[in-house]
UniProtKB/Swiss-Prot annotation:
Keywords tagged on the record: Cytoplasm, Stress response
Protein name, per record: 18.9 kDa heat shock protein
Gene (UniProt): HSP18.9
sHSP domain: residues covered: 63-177
Provenance organism: Oryza sativa subsp. japonica (Rice)
Homology family: Belongs to the small heat shock protein (HSP20) family.
GO BP field: protein complex oligomerization; protein folding; response to heat; response to hydrogen peroxide; response to salt stress
Residues in coiled coil: none
Compartments in which it is found: Cytoplasm
Stretch list, region Disordered: 1-35
GO MF term set: unfolded protein binding
Biased composition (Gly residues): 17-32
GO cellular component: cytoplasm
Summary of subunit composition and partner proteins: May form oligomeric structures.
Length: 177
């Protein structure tokens, strides 16, 4: 039962018990706030899925030119840190992988929109051109000199070897006046 049906049901029960319509519209008693008359929309309410709204923030961000993020997994093996990012429909030339100062991995790029051919009629376009960026601070044992990246079947895999010989560097800092 939808929320609207249950609200309307409470209103009808209150009226049957002699509470009147009550609420803000005046009818006395009842104490319930009368819902806006939405019974005309009731048949459509169950068809609206909350998952349809889940994509709205990213669609709005893309329309505003705000970069989206790529879904990414990070696993650590004995020898390396391995990052796997979903890049469906992205070509190698459209992705940039870099390690910034202070060991920050940055994946960025732009997914190109398919060119419209003359004589074609599009019925729906959801895969628009969009920029994406993802940054991850790497752990101290990441050896950024040996980074390897590969794009295969829409998955970008970045392997960063571990520097297992590196010991945490601790030092005493002198205090000056």
């Amino acid at each position: 039962m939808s929320m609207i049906t249950s609200m309307l049901g409470r209103k009808q029960n209150a009226q049957q018990k002699g509470g009147g319509g009550g609420g803000r519209t005046g009818g006395g008693g009842g104490g319930e706030i009368e819902p806006v008359s939405v019974d005309i929309m009731e048949p459509f309410m169950d068809a609206i899925s909350l998952t349809a709204f889940a994509a709205a923030p990213s669609a709005a961000a893309a329309a505003a030119g705000v970069p989206s993020t790529a879904s990414m997994d990070w696993k650590e093996t004995a020898a390396a840190h391995v990052f796997m990012a979903d890049m469906p429909g992205v070509r190698r030339e459209e992705v940039r992988v870099e390690v910034e100062e202070e060991k920050v991995l940055r994946i960025s790029g732009q997914r190109a929109r398919a060119a419209e051919e003359k004589g074609e009629r599009w019925h729906r376009v959801e895969r628009s051109s969009e920029r994406f960026v993802r940054t991850v601070r790497l752990p101290p044992n990441a050896n950024t000199d040996g980074v390897h990246a590969a794009l295969d079947n829409g998955v970008l895999t970045i392997t960063i070897p571990k520097d297992n010989d590196r010991k945490p560097h601790a030092r005493i800092i002198p205090i000056t006046n």
